[in-house]
């Protein structure tokens, strides 16, 4: 079966075998159940490739090596698994035809007159170009189409397919540009009577699609092509292209005769003839003069780039640009004004557009250099001015000044037509400066926050240290009171800084920024609380603090004076009381709980987004520092340390009671009476006695008698122990040097050793 056929030859002849082709592909007897699609566009833009991809046809495609014309005339084929007749039209602007645009216009007019949907295939970089986007061709086609068929014209769809779409410019913006060009083209054509006020949408529905690069973005190209295919094939698709109003209402078996009649009408119409020889000559010569003028223009552009590196003022730049344009126009006008005025005027406008387009590059570099210079100097200027003023005020004024500088430059260039959108240039600078302001602000606020947290952590750690050195049952009330006090101080300071750095006029989300920074600081204070208390309640540290607390409460009275016990029952009572108080503190320190039994309330979420909700930052475990195992370990450790202290004190009482029996004092009074009387009679000894008595009296009155007594007892005990050890050494030496004596006097030595050992053992 024949896959495709040539409907119109390259010599503008209609194929008489077209009816046989329709029969071969099975479209001759489908009645109205068929559709016609044609594709227009420049040569070598991939029209045939697109049709093959969309409809499964097998049109010949371009030789990518030699880049020769493949489609000559108009070829037709039936879409795979569909009743769609596809027309592949020879590309426009091909080198094979050169300036012969007659076939281009006639084939385009034929396509519009016979097809329901006309695919206009173009590259993205052709948009905005008058010739490249086929606006000249469409203008002629629209005009003649109205003249020939306005009495019985049918609606059609123009489906623009933008190829090699990059996405840097949105499809909406490209569509808007094309639609503007179409409306301008339609407005410029001469219309038949009664259609003077018509618009293009009265006769055409216009839509736009975009396809990525077929080679560089193959997967994306296939995906978007599949979507576009569904618009042709799926009647349930919201973007289905073949609306009933587009159909020409010609049965399939009569379509060959209908198309042949359309082609003959177009062939015989003089309105589609080639331009006159005078116009051709004018166009040809004016193009030569444009090329000549552009040589001089390009040389001056190179000089302009060097000129711009010196950062000249905008006035000097405008003068230079005007001189370049004047010089270029003078070269063109010198010869071109002698030719047809209409062609001369159009070509002069074309030259002006070309110059504006090429000058856009150095001008953009000039504006980019100003932009870069302003942005580079912005942080330094802010840092200089902020020393004497508020950050937000300095930032607002500096942004306004720099934006004003850019606006004056861009507006002056826009006024002369060198810049299309000065506001966009200014807005780009404004956005970047505001981003710099935000970046500098965040950096400074982070420094302030870090500094405040260091200060807070240090002061809170000092307060915690003091509280844990003097453990009480209301320790948590004291700590939380100090925490709230220091925290309020830090938050107030941070809020003041936020008000200095965040500008309600420049920042739409000013309140949100304040809330975010305050939230982070509040959370940090709670984490410092947790971290500091974890350090203080670590098992070894807490054990030592509780031992110290026990000894302080057990060994010293309320005035801080060391206690001396004479009776065991008093010692035991003091021990039990101090031990119970100390052990009760373990439960107190295990969890932060205030006097009223409540746990402090955390005013911010402690777990960051994404953290496990069962982490130790949750409220139910945040204030718990000792579990059962830790409490048991600390309890045992403190109890053992307390027992050792108790035994030491108990031993001291027993030792004192054992060393000084009651009869000793009576014996001392009887035997020492004479000595006592002699002391009273001797002035020197009496004076010495009075001094000693006075010293003892002072010790008793100041409460130092107990410590002095304990010191003396320890000294005597140590001296006795030392003497016993020395005596034992002497006895050992004596045994080693006198064995006979040891034998004969064994019992005596044994008795002596026994008495010494007994004497040493009674000294605790």
UniProtKB/Swiss-Prot annotation:
Keywords from the UniProt entry: Coiled coil, Endoplasmic reticulum, GTP-binding, Hydrolase, Membrane, Nucleotide-binding, Transmembrane, Transmembrane helix
Biased composition (Polar residues): 736-754
Pfam families noted in UniProt: RHD3_GTPase, Sey1_3HB
Location of this chain's protein in the cell: Endoplasmic reticulum membrane
Domain GB1/RHD3-type G: 31-246
InterPro entries: G_GB1_RHD3_dom, P-loop_NTPase, RHD3/Sey1, Sey1/RHD3-like_3HB
Residues in compartment: Lumenal: 681-683
Family classification: Belongs to the TRAFAC class dynamin-like GTPase superfamily. GB1/RHD3 GTPase family. RHD3 subfamily.
Protein's name according to its UniProt entry: Protein sey1
């Amino acid at each position: 079966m024949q896959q495709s056929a040539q409907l119109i030859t390259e010599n503008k002849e209609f194929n008489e075998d077209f009816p046989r082709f329709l029969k071969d592909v099975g479209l001759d007897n489908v009645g109205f159940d068929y559709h016609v699609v044609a594709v227009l566009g420049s040569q070598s833009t991939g029209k045939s490739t697109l049709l093959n991809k969309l409809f499964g046809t097998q049109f010949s495609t371009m030789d990518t090596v030699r880049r020769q014309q493949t489609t000559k005339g108009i070829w037709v084929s039936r879409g795979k698994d569909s009743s769609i007749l596809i027309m592949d039209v020879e590309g426009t602007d091909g080198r094979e035809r050169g300036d012969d645009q007659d076939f281009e216009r006639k084939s385009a007019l034929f396509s519009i007159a016979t097809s329901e949907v006309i695919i206009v295939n173009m590259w993205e970089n052709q948009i905005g170009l008058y010739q490249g986007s086929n606006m000249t061709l469409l203008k002629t086609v629209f005009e003649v189409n109205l003249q020939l068929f306005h009495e019985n014209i049918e609606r059609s769809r123009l489906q623009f397919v933008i190829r090699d779409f990059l996405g840097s410019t949105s499809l909406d913006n490209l569509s808007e540009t094309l639609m503007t060009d179409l409306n301008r083209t339609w407005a410029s054509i001469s219309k038949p009577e009664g259609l003077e006020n018509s618009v293009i949408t009265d006769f055409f529905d216009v839509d736009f699609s975009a396809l990525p690069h077929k080679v560089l973005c193959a997967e994306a190209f296939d995906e978007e092509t599949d979507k576009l295919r569904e618009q042709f094939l799926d009647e349930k698709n919201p973007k289905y292209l073949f609306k009933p109003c587009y159909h020409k209402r010609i049965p399939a078996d009569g379509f060959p005769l209908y198309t042949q009649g359309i082609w003959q009408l177009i062939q015989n119409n003089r309105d589609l003839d080639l331009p006159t020889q005078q116009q051709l000559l004018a166009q040809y010569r004016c193009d030569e003069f444009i090329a000549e003028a552009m040589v001089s223009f390009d040389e001056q552009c190179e000089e302009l780039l060097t000129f711009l590196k010196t950062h000249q003022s905008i006035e000097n730049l405008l003068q230079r640009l005007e001189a370049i344009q004047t010089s270029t126009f003078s070269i063109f006008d010198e010869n071109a004004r002698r030719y047809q005025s209409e062609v001369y005027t159009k070509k002069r406008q074309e030259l002006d557009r070309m110059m504006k387009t090429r000058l856009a590059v150095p001008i953009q570099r000039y504006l980019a250099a100003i932009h870069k210079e302003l942005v580079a100097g912005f942080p330094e200027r802010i840092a200089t001015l902020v020393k004497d003023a508020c950050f937000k005020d300095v930032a607002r004024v500096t942004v306004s000044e720099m934006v004003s500088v850019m606006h004056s430059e861009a507006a002056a260039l826009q006024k002369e037509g060198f810049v299309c959108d000065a506001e966009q240039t200014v807005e780009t600078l404004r956005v970047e400066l505001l981003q710099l302001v935000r970046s500098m602000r965040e950096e400074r606020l982070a420094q302030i926050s870090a500094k405040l947290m260091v200060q807070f952590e240090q002061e809170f750690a000092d307060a915690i240290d003091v509280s844990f050195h003097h453990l009480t049952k209301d320790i948590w009330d004291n700590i939380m009171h100090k925490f709230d006090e220091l925290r309020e101080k830090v938050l107030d300071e941070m809020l003041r800084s936020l008000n200095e750095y965040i500008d309600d006029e420049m920042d739409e989300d000013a309140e949100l920024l304040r809330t975010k920074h305050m939230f982070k600081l509040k959370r940090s204070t709670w984490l410092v609380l947790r971290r500091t208390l974890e350090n203080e309640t670590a098992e070894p540290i807490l054990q030592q603090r509780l031992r110290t607390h026990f000894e302080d409460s057990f060994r010293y009275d309320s005035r801080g004076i060391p206690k001396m016990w004479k009776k065991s029952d008093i010692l035991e009572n003091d021990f039990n009381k101090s031990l119970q108080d100390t052990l009760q503190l373990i439960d107190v320190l295990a969890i932060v709980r205030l006097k009223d039994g409540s746990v402090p309330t955390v005013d911010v979420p402690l777990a960051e987004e994404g953290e496990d909700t069962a982490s130790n930052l949750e409220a139910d475990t945040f204030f718990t520092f000792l579990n059962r195992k830790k409490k048991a370990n600390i309890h045992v450790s403190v109890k053992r340390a307390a027992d050792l202290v108790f035994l030491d004190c108990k031993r001291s009482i027993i030792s004192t009671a054992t060393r000084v029996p009651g009869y000793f004092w009576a014996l001392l009074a009887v035997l020492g009476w004479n000595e006592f009387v002699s002391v009273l009679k001797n002035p020197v000894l009496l004076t010495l006695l009075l001094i000693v008595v006075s010293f003892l009296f002072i010790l008793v009155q100041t409460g130092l008698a107990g410590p002095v007594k304990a010191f003396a007892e320890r000294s005597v005990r140590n001296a006795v122990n030392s003497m016993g050890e020395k005596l034992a050494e002497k006895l050992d030496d004596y045994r080693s040097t006198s064995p006979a004596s040891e034998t004969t006097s064994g019992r005596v030595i044994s008795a002596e050793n026994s008495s010494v050992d007994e004497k040493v053992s009674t000294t605790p």
